[in-house]
């Protein structure tokens, strides 16, 4: 008798509202010869309250009410489910949204007309390879030295005879029409050895005539006449030291300090004046006449429910706009 396959059903919390989807997943697993041993909510596995056994299940089915292109699944659980599956075990319920996570966790994506699943493949273990640490010895012959590394090239200093031979060979190949490179190098060296001031003078000669005194710009031309007419910062000429200062000296005896104090006193007096209204100004605002200027609320006539906290009509019944109200009784209360 063939051994039955073990299965696991993982349920999305939203699928509990429709138990028929969970029942259909269990029946579909039984029709394929899989015995469902357990079913868990996916959030129980995510928070670690339920742990799955390694290499225990042949098939895992994930039941979710979400559409295939809107599935939201914790990526870290793909590796946990992969460890719980046996080799060639299948995982149903996920989509291509997590295709990269499937490949990372050694799953192979299987597509068919009726089923879409991930198949767990056997992991390939890296086998250790022995690497020799010592270099092989090579046979040496007299007059030659060989080592594990390649020998470095040997350079020889050129002599005057060698340089003349090279020049003759170059002239034979290039012909008399071309100028030798050595002459060009000599010209460059002669140009580079010249005084740097000569090169600067040549540059200015090419760019144009040098600047003269007539080409200089005066500072007064940069300032407009309107700017010059604007009053500058007021300076005080001290009568004792005959120097210009912004304020009077601390031990001033020429009278500038008294002048400043008089100006400050005049400003303070203007600020200390109390604003007083005349009778005509006080009666300009009438809260009881409709159409005239009113206060912030404008609802003194409506009653206490609509009046401000500082309204003088608090405690009085509602009245019509323009009606005369006697407030003498309030003075008795006060």
UniProtKB/Swiss-Prot annotation:
Residues 135-229 are annotated as: Disordered. One of its GO terms (biological process) is iron-sulfur cluster assembly. Residues 238-254 are annotated as: Fe-S binding site A. Pfam families: CIAPIN1, DRE2_N. [4Fe-4S] cluster binds at residues 297, 300, 308, 311. Residues 140-150 have a biased composition (Low complexity). This is Fe-S cluster assembly protein DRE2.
């Amino acid at each position: 008798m063939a051994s039955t396959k073990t299965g696991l059903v993982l349920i999305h919390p939203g699928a509990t509202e429709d138990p028929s989807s969970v029942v259909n997943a269990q029946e579909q697993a039984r029709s394929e010869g899989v015995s469902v041993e357990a079913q868990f909510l996916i959030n129980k596995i995510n928070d670690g309250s339920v742990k799955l056994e390694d290499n225990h299940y042949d098939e895992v089915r994930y039941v979710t009410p979400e559409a295939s292109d809107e599935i939201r699944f914790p990526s870290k659980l793909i590796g946990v489910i992969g460890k719980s599956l046996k080799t060639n075990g299948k995982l149903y319920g996920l989509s291509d949204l997590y295709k990269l996570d499937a490949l990372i966790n050694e799953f192979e994506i299987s597509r068919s007309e009726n089923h879409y699943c991930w198949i767990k493949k056997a992991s390939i273990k890296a086998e250790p390879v022995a690497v020799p640490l010592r270099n092989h010895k090579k046979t040496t012959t007299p007059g030659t030295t060989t080592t594990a590394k390649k020998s470095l090239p040997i350079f020889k200093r050129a002599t005057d005879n060698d340089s003349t031979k090279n020049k003759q060979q170059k002239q034979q190949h290039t012909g008399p029409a071309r100028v030798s490179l050595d002459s060009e190098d000599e010209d460059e060296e002669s140009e580079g050895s010249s005084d740097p001031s000569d090169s600067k003078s040549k540059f200015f000669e090419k760019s144009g005539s040098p600047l003269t005194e007539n080409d200089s710009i005066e500072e007064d031309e940069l300032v407009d006449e309107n700017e010059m007419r604007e009053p500058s910062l007021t300076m005080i000429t001290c009568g004792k030291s005959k120097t210009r200062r912004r304020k009077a000296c601390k031990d001033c005896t020429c009278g500038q300090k008294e002048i400043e104090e008089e100006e400050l006193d005049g400003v303070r007096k203007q600020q200390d004046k109390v604003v007083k209204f005349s009778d005509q100004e006080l009666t300009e605002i009438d809260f009881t006449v409709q159409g005239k200027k009113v206060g912030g609320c404008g609802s003194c006539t409506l009653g206490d429910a609509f009046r401000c906290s500082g309204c003088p009509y608090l405690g009085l019944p509602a009245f019509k706009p323009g009606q005369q109200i006697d407030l003498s009784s309030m003075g008795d209360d006060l």
